[in-house]
Amino acid sequence: MSCGDVNQNQNQNCGCLADILKKILLLQRQDYDNENYKGCDKPYLGPICSTICYNTRPIMLFNCCTGAPWSFTYTINNQTSTSDVFRIEAIDDCCCTCRILYLDTATNRYLGTSEFFTINLDCVGALRCLPDTFIDLC
């Protein structure tokens, strides 16, 4: 399938990326039962899952046609800029909603914006995960 093609089996085309994004979303929501994960497959580090050090796995999404990173504009303190780093907030079939993150150069940490976008995963050719971090979501 090439970029922009329409296919009746679209959900199968984005399955691999959607599965990964669903796992990331699960981790970010800390939405698991501690009793169900006792072995190597537990999706957190440390002795108990209530110890929260990180709440975000920043991601980059790459265009399926060009390979270029997707980037979106955001405005903070009346300054408009662009970012190509995001936090997954929701996923529904082949569409995911992301929060735009930006790098605070003073602290060298990603911060969250109050700006979101929804993208069709059929338009995404690759996903890059960045190191886990804590984002203040309030």
What is the role of each PLM region?
Residues 90-95:
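A short, structured loop/turn motif at beta-sheet edges
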Residues 1-89, 100-138:
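Short glycine-rich, low-complexity segments
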